[in-house]
C-alpha cells in the first residue's frame, strides 16, 4: 500500500473498526518516501525504494503471496510492469471523494457507507446497496465523524 492508504487503514485499525483486526497480524509493506519510521501499525515495514523494483526483488526472493490495498498509483505501476498475477476485487465501504490522491469519485465528498443489502447474480455480479454518511474529514482520522445530517 502507499502512504495515503496506510494513513486511512491504520486509522481504522487504531479505532478498532470491524475487519481490521485480521490485518493487524499480517505482514504489511508501505511504499512511501514521505512517511518515517517507526510506523504505528503492527507488522508494517516501510520501503522507500521504488515500488516496482522492490516488488520485483521480493518476488525473486520467493515471496509469492502479495496483495495491494487501495493505492491506485501503486496498482497501476505494478500492472504496467507485469508484476500482477491475479486480480482479487474487494469492495471496501468508504469513498474518498475529496481526500483521495487519485479520485475515482472526483467531486464527491468523503463518505462512509453502511451496507444494507447485497445480492449476487450469476455468481459474477454483485449488487451492493449502501446508506451513505458524509464525513466531516478524511476517513480514518479524528475528524471522520459524520457531518451534521445527511441521511
Give, region by region, the residue ranges found by the protein language model:
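Enzymes that bind and transform nitrogen-containing heteroaromatic metabolites
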Residues: 1-151
Amino acid at each position: 500500500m502507499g502512504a495515503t492508504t496506510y494513513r486511512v487503514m491504520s486509522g481504522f485499525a487504531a479505532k478498532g473498526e470491524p475487519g481490521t483486526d485480521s490485518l493487524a497480524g499480517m505482514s504489511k509493506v508501505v511504499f512511501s518516501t514521505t512517511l518515517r519510521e517507526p510506523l504505528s501499525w503492527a507488522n508494517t515495514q516501510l520501503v522507500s525504494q521504488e515500488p516496482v523494483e522492490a516488488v520485483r526483488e521480493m518476488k525473486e526472493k520467493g515471496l509469492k503471496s502479495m496483495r495491494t490495498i487501495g493505492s491506485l498509483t501503486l496498482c497501476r505501476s505494478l500492472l504496467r510492469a507485469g508484476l500482477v498475477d491475479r486480480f482479487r476485487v474487494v469492495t471496501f465501504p468508504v469513498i474518498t471523494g475529496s481526500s483521495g490522491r487519485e479520485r475515482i469519485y472526483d467531486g464527491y465528498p468523503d463518505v462512509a457507507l453502511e451496507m444494507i443489502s447485497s445480492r449476487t447474480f450469476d455468481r459474477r455480479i454483485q449488487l451492493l446497496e449502501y446508506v451513505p454518511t458524509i464525513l466531516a474529514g478524511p476517513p480514518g482520522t479524528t475528524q471522520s465523524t459524520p457531518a451534521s445530517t445527511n441521511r
